[in-house]
Each structure stands twice: as C-alpha cells, then as structure tokens.
Amino acid sequence: QSYLLTSRWIGSVVGEVEGLDPQDKEKVDFYSRQFLSAMAPSNFVITNPAVLRQTAESGGENLLKGLENLLEDLERGKGRLKISMTDESAFEVGKNVATTPGKVIYQNELMQLIQYEPSTEEVHRRPLLFVPPWINKFYVLDLQPKNSLIKWAVDRGHTLFVVSWVNPRKELARKDFEDYMREGPLAALDAIERATGEREVNVLGFCIGGILMVATLAYLAAKGDTRVKSATFLATMVDLKDIGEVSVFIDEEQLRSLEEHVAEKGYLEGHHMAQMFNMMRENDLIWSFVVNNYLLGRDPMPFDLLYWNADSTRLPATMLVTYLRKIYQDNGLMKPGHLVLDGVPIDIRKIETPSYFVATKEDHIAPWVSS
C-alpha cells in the first residue's frame, strides 16, 4: 500500500511541474516511471510473497538457480546484462520459425530478395513485395504457420517477394538512407521484373520499411515511374510531430552523443535499440523476467515472438544519423524537398498510388496519430 501511495504521489508531483517543454515533460514522466517500476516490491526477495514461499519450499535453491541464470545472462551479453526472455534453444530459423518455402533470387550489399514458392494451382499475375524494417529481422512476418503473414499471402495466390536486410558491419558504415532505397525496394522491383516478366507490383511496407516505401513512392512519382500499383503500410509513421515516448531518446544532446558513438564504431549495436524498446514496456520486458529468472530461479518459456525480439540487428552509422536527423527530428517527410534521395527532392504530396494504412491504438512505438 505504501508503494502504491508513494507512486501516486510522485506521479501527481511530476504531473504538476510547471515550465517544462513537452519533450522535457515526457522525459520526466518516463524516467519517473522507470524508477517506480524498478522499486516495485515484487522485484525484491523480501517483499515478494511468491519468492519468499519458493525460497522456503526449495531451501533457497531458487536463489542459487537465479544466480546461475544471472551469470549466464552476463556471459551472453559479454559483461552487459542481456536478460533471457525465452528459451532460445527451442527455435531455429528455417526449422521451426520462418519455415514458409522460398529461395533467394537476388542479393546485394544491403539485402537478399526471397521469392516464396506458390502453394496454389493459380497465382495472381501481379507480384507482391514486402519491405520489412531493418531494425530487426524479416521473419516476424513468418514466425509460425498459424500466424505467418507470409504464408497467408502465399496461400491466397500471391507471388510473394520479401526483402531480408543484411545485418551490417563497419564496412557498411557509409551506407545512407538513399542507399537503402536504391539497394532495397528499387533493386527489388528490378529483380522482380527479371524473375516474373511483370513490371507492375503491389507493395507492403512495415515500420521503418514502410517509411522507406513512402519516401520511395515519392521518389518514383517524381521520376514518373508508375510500377507500384498499390501500397499497404503497417505501423508506419509519416507525420512524426507526435512520436510518443520515443521522443525521450531523441533530443539534441543524445543525438550528438549517438553520432560520436557510431562515428567510432561504424554502426549502432543491436542491443541499444533493444534496450530502448524494452524500457518502453519495462514491466513486461524487463522486471517480469528479473523476477522469473533471477528471484524465482525459473527458465523463461519458449515464445517465438520474444525469440525474434531478441534477434536484434546493427544499424549503419550514416543511415542512422540521416534517419534520426532528417526524418525524426526534422519531420522531413512532411516538409516538401527537405529530404533529398539520390538527387531527388522528396514530396509525398505527389504520391498518387492507392494506399492503405494499418495503425493500432495501443502501439507505443509507432503511435497511430503519426500514420
């Protein structure tokens, strides 16, 4: 009760602070919540009844097993705590996740293009291209047959192609956002035409892959290229005026620090993005596993989505800075000509492609109001 009362009091005090701009207020709210979540009684042995009961019944074996789990996670993270969220040994890409049959028909420095085998006697004439994000792996669209968007599309007669982005190392540090356009969707469109003989395609963009497709459609419109006949967007932000809690991590001071870091490394390590996303759902993605793994001494259950979530990717330095500066900080897609890709000023007002946007009310990463 005292914790709940204190939490409410801190929340009310924080909410009444005057003179803060919206971004600073978002930070105060966010980090106050992080502190309160960390201090919850359930996160401590002596104030968690379930942990006390387990400790008494097992003679403390749960705490010893929890210590083993903690040390294993520190070892996996090479000194950085990488909390296990699922039994990663239970999954293998191509074996029990990402199992829809297909093959790579084209590749370049930034991606491989997968063409999936048809499962119907007849297929639609116009191919379908999926452009997923490169902040994580493509197979979130193909986890299990029962929840695979890829399998669903193939089973409905679509000749499906999916971009699988490379996990970049330092040698790709100079790859920019426009390189992702040239070597991603534009290269894929050419490869699809070579493979099928069909010039016209439908596309689906997801997350940052959707943002890339919005910019690409504006680029194609400026070029008079009408190959893309329809576009569907999932969790895709266009107007980044209101980006919710993500704004906590994107201010001038943090961007300068990030620029210095990636200039030295050549890329942003995957765990930085993973940590940010986990902090936005800290009770579900951090503290529940701290209690389960380290206090109760249990192993996490197999869960395909969390296996994918833990399979993080790196981001090239130049692309990341352009993306965060031009698109996030400057809201560049909403400013005609502010973003220039391959010499072409991007103006999304010129897009005439029929488009459908799917945005969910509770999406904390891509708020629906920004779609």
Segments predicted by a language model, with ranges:
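Alpha/beta-hydrolase active-site loop
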Residues: 172-196
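Short beta-strand/loop motif that positions the catalytic acidic residue
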Residues: 351, 357-359, 363
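Short, surface-exposed "cap/lid" segments of acyl-processing enzymes
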Residues: 69, 73-169
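Alpha/beta-hydrolase fold nucleophile elbow
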Residues: 189-209
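Mobile cap/lid helix-loop segments that gate and shape the active-site cleft of serine hydrolases
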Residues: 309-345, 353
